[in-house]
Amino acid sequence: TANSEEQVRNIYRPLVATILLGPLKELMRVRDTFIRILQPGREGEADALDLDRIDVVTASAKSRLGNPITDAEQDEAGLYTKSNGMIAVATTQRRGAAGMGGRTHAWTNAWDPGEDSYAQQVFENAEDDVFVFYRNPDLAKSLRHRDGRPLDFNLKSERLKMLEYVYRGSPWVDLNSIESEAKALMKTDPTQAERFFGNRLVQGGGAWLEDGLWESCYAGA
């Protein structure tokens, strides 16, 4: 599941390749917009029975919504908003999975706090039985100055410390390449650079108030 067909292909293409190049090839059939999971002894009847399948779902391809499902993989949930219709898609999938004892999984880069995305709603309203993992660099004591101030993503030396923290446990990531891209993006869209590379929850350029300003006016009230 993703906001656009191009985006959903980010996970659908590797899945198709895994099937066609591995032992699952004999157990599944790849179609144009879905993958059929074959039933033992019923290969010829699989399409007619319309049983187990893996579907592509986007904002413009929602024909299967409402069907009972056992799993939904929701890519870049930080881009799911009310205006693009993807919050309705995600919540419908959760209801469908709940009815079948299934699960949904969502992942994303840091979201824009001003958009009230699906990822933001899940994070802020998470129940005890919902697992949420977010490595927030602003909560790491090692990424603060002695006076408690968070590191400045605009400064290369401090930005590198944040990148090392964010990408810890991902040895395949080239931090030099990430640093180059972050530096370039800082020139045109600094808040996006902080969200995408620094994993920080900062508002986009359209924000009418600075982060924390509204809340600080009511601190201690």
Name the predicted role of every residue range:
Residues 31-96, 219:
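Conserved RecA-like ASCE ATPase "motif II neighborhood" in helicase/translocase motors
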Residues 9-10, 64-66, 81-82, 115-116, ...:
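Short helix/loop capping segments that flank catalytic or ligand/cofactor-binding pockets
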Residues 24-30, 61-73, 131-141:
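Short, surface-exposed, charge-dense and proline/glycine-enriched linear segments
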Residues 1-60, 119-120, 187-188:
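Conserved nucleotide-state-sensing and coupling region of NTP-binding domains
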Residues 3-5, 59-61, 77, 82, ...:
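An acidic- and aromatic-residue-enriched active-site/binding cleft used to recognize and process polar
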Residues 2-5, 9, 13, 29, ...:
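Conserved structured core elements
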Residues 8-9, 42-47, 77-80, 108, ...:
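N-terminal start-of-chain detector that recognizes signal peptides
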Residues 84-221:
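Non-catalytic, compositionally simple segments
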